[in-house]
Regions:
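Active-site-adjacent structural elements that line small-molecule/cofactor binding pockets in enzymes
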Residues: 1-328
């Protein structure tokens, strides 16, 4: 489950929804680190108040915190609830890193690789001795973790998937058309084989944009409004084209460059949206989650497209582990 609240009351709303979700059988809660509410601070609140749920970050951009800051934060969160925290890392985007933070979005693959390598050194309690292409650290040391914290990596394209297969404990997918999932899973399998790791060595998680509703058009339009801008980003746009929607990706890129958001939304046809999002009746959404699980998705990170509390609870209740077991 992925709650996303912003503004006054965001922490209490997230906590209330998370405690309710834990009470109906959810095993994980995942927090996006995109601003407005600091995900790592919020994770501490949730770890302290929940009893058994994993609390994960999906994901934090590697440019906005140094490895030493990540290491200290991870140690703190791991101490609150040993064995229940998961750190997800990713590159972020040009818009986020350069636009929001004023930082250079340089060599994202190398930056993620070096961050993971240096962070693992620090979490093991070693004195840092690292000179990379982009990062360096000397003399930092903290006590080793008593219980390892898994590191997940966000990945869309083959090179980042390759890195996750080599260096991570899990992989976070996002916004992929269902029809592209076999290619993605084969890419992961082949990357693990090249890395000399077992097929089950990498936990495969994905964000799922969902809404249980009697009016699928409502969910589709929410998806277009919320995620249309994502596909104007070159990374997501090229991923959409790679997944088989070349014409739609080209139209979105052109419309986005012109600032024509109506065209962007229109290019996300019902076919495209239905291939990516999980929107519709309870039975339809449950079936989609079963299809994803059968294809190799182990950890669904459900995000409700609506911010209406009734929509959220209906969606999360219908797709809870208990309900999925009954419906199987």
């Amino acid at each position: 489950m992925t709650p996303l609240f912003t503004g006054p009351g965001a922490v209490s709303k997230t906590l209330d929804l998370t405690l309710w979700a834990e009470s109906i059988g959810y095993e994980d809660v995942w927090l996006p680190d995109t601003g407005a509410v600091d995900a790592l601070t919020l994770a501490g609140v949730l770890l302290d108040r929940t009893e058994r749920m994993r609390v994960g970050i999906a994901v934090s951009p590697v440019y906005t915190r140094t490895p030493a800051v990540f290491a200290a934060t991870v140690a703190t969160l791991a101490d609150i609830a040993p064995g229940r925290f998961v750190l997800g890392l990713g590159s972020g985007s040009e818009t986020m890193i350069n636009g929001w933070h004023g930082l250079e979005f340089r060599k994202p693959l190398a930056r993620v690789r070096e961050t993971v390598a240096l962070l693992r050194q620090m979490l093991a309690g070693e004195k840092s001795q690292f000179d990379g292409e982009l990062l360096r650290s000397h003399g930092y040391r903290q006590p080793p973790l008593e219980v390892d914290v898994p590191i997940f990596l966000a990945a869309l394209r083959p090179r980042m998937i390759e890195l996750a297969a080599c260096a991570a404990d899990g992989i976070v997918l996002n916004l992929f058309p269902l029809g592209a999932l076999p290619r993605i899973m084969e890419t992961i399998r082949a990357a693990l084989e090249r890395a000399g790791r077992d097929a089950g060595a990498l936990e495969v998680a994905t964000r799922i944009q969902a809404l249980v509703t009697d009016d699928a058009d409502v969910g589709r339009n929410l998806f277009r409004r919320l995620f249309g801008p994502y596909f104007t980003n070159p990374v997501y746009n090229s991923f959409l084209a790679w997944a088989g929607y070349e014409d739609e990706a080209a139209e979105i890129l052109e419309a986005g460059a012109a600032g024509d958001w109506r065209r962007v939304r229109a290019a996300l046809t019902d076919e495209v949206v239905d291939d990516i999002a999980v929107v519709g009746s309870r039975e339809h959404c449950q079936e989609r989650l079963r299809v994803l699980a059968e294809a190799g998705i182990q950890t669904p990170m459900l995000f409700c497209l609506s911010d209406d509390p009734e929509d959220q609870r209906r969606t999360f209740a219908a797709l809870s582990p208990a309900e999925m077991s009954v419906a199987a």
